[in-house]
């Protein structure tokens, strides 16, 4: 084992794995530091909302220092992405320090709003009146900023940024779910299992399949057997869209509650129109999922920059003029790819959610299946990241000559 670790081609990946494990150890330790005892928490029947929080690294079963998870940070990234979408050139010219400060300041503001909402919705009224609510908010905000810092450090020195934290949070949430006796026939149960397996295969298809757009490369005109192409994934945004859409939905609910509570202290915490027990709440979430997924995918593809790169290099698409025509052609192709991928993901997530409205006695099992699907999707992305680091091994014969 020691000899294996000493080989350079594996050294980077092992260092990153160890760093990620250390980050996860701190995260697990933090989730076990309770601010309020379990007996002082309100019992909520909206189980999927708790599951949604866990998909951002949070936990509302107990009020701990990492209860908010990465939700405020993901929401701040969404807001900044939408602001910069209209002028990507200006965004690309910003320094890392400028982006960092904007993200952190916005995360701080959103953390305060979401902390206020979580305390009033999940902590008993007696405990809220007894404790210093501002001190509790300060602890939650501090824990959130610490978790954001850990996720940022993992992006630089670990593997897959915030995804391992979210994956551990989902696993923890799945283990805490109480699976009661299933009041359904064996045919229905078998059908659910088959649907989950089919869904996982579709997600694997979405993640691994890519769309290739051939173009003429002026540097390789002599190589007739080598074709140049521009490749995009069917869902360019990947699993980060699921976390961001849940974060935006949670912030929407907490933001509306925060504003209404300023004018009416006796406002209901439940807001049934924005829950997953309501078709309106599910529809709002799916619309957010599609819109954010589309904007994030277009942001990552960045067709405007791609058209500029083609204009500078002299490469072109057959039958398409350079410049504005190339940009319009790429925009058309990008819209087709993004909407197709997002439609598949939205249908996969949406059908089980709507299904719980018709068979509420199977809601726990359906939510468990949805969480399993999200877990597999995130695991695929983490595996892709690890495989990228392992590509170094393929160049060993060449690099050893110069090392």
Curated annotation (Swiss-Prot):
Entry's localization field: Cell membrane
Coiled-coil stretches = none
Give the matching Gene3D superfamilies: SecY subunit domain
One Gene Ontology term of the molecular function aspect: protein transmembrane transporter activity
Gene Ontology CC annotations of this record: cell envelope Sec protein transport complex; plasma membrane
| Keyword Transport attributed | yes
Enumerate the transmembrane spans.
17-37, 63-83, 105-125, 131-151, 157-177, 186-206, 240-260, 276-296, 339-359, 366-386
Give the membrane topology: Multi-pass membrane protein
Q: What happens when the gene is disrupted?
A: No effect on cell growth, significantly reduces export of the cell wall protein SraP. The small amount that is exported seems to be glycosylated normally. A double secG/secY2 mutant enters stationary phase earlier and has significant differences in the export pattern of a number of extracellular proteins (shown in RN4220). Single or double deletions are as virulent as wild-type (shown in RN4220 and SH1000).
Q: Which Pfam families match?
A: SecY
Q: Disulphide bridges in this chain? A: none
Instruction: Tell me which HAMAP family the record gives.
Output: SecY2 (MF_01466)
Similarity comment: family membership: Belongs to the SecY/SEC61-alpha family. SecY2 subfamily.
The task this protein performs is described as: The central subunit of a protein translocation channel (Potential). Part of the accessory SecA2/SecY2 system specifically required to export SraP, a serine-rich repeat cell wall protein encoded upstream in the same operon.
Q: Subunit structure, briefly?
A: May form heterotrimers with SecE and SecG subunits (Potential). Component of the accessory SecA2/SecY2 protein translocase complex required to export cell wall protein SrpA.
Name of the molecule in the record: Accessory Sec system protein translocase subunit SecY2
Taxonomic placement: Bacteria, Bacillati, Bacillota, Bacilli, Bacillales
Gene symbol? secY2
């Amino acid at each position: 084992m020691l000899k294996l670790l000493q080989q350079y081609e594996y050294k980077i990946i092992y260092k990153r794995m160890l760093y990620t494990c250390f980050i996860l150890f701190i995260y697990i330790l933090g989730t076990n530091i309770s601010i309020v005892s379990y007996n002082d928490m309100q019992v909520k029947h909206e189980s999927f909302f708790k599951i949604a929080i866990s998909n951002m690294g949070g936990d509302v079963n107990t009020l701990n220092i990492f209860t908010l998870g990465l939700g405020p940070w993901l929401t701040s990234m969404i807001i900044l992405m939408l602001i910069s979408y209209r002028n990507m050139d200006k965004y690309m010219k910003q320094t890392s320090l400028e982006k960092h400060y904007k993200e952190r300041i916005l995360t701080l503001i959103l953390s305060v709003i979401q902390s206020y909402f979580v305390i009033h919705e999940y902590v008993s009224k007696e405990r809220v009146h007894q404790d210093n609510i501002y001190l509790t908010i300060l602890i939650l905000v501090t824990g959130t900023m610490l978790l954001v810092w850990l996720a940022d450090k993992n992006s630089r020195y670990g593997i897959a940024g915030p995804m391992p934290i979210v994956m551990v949070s989902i696993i923890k949430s799945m283990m805490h779910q109480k699976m009661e006796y299933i009041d359904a026939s064996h045919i229905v149960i078998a059908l659910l299992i088959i649907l989950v397996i089919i869904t996982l295969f579709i997600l694997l298809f979405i993640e691994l399949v890519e769309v290739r757009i051939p173009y003429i490369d002026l540097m390789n005109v002599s190589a007739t057997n080598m074709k140049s192409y521009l490749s995009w994934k069917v869902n360019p945004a990947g699993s980060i869209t699921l976390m961001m859409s849940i974060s935006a939905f949670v912030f929407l609910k907490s933001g509306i509650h925060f504003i209404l509570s300023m004018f009416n202290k006796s406002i209901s915490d439940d807001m049934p129109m924005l829950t997953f027990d309501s078709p309106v709440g599910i529809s709002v979430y799916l619309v957010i999922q599609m819109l954010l997924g589309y904007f994030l995918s277009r942001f990552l593809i960045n067709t405007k920059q791609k058209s500029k790169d083609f204009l500078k290099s002299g490469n072109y698409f057959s039958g398409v003029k350079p410049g504005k025509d190339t940009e319009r052609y790429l925009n058309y192709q990008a819209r087709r790819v993004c909407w197709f991928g997002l439609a598949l993901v939205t249908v996969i997530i949406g059908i089980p959610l709507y299904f719980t409205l018709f068979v509420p006695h199977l809601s726990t099992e359906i939510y468990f299946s949805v969480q399993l699907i999200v877990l597999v999707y995130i695991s695929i992305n983490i595996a892709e990241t690890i495989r990228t680091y392992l590509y170094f091994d393929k160049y060993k014969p060449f690099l050893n000559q110069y090392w």
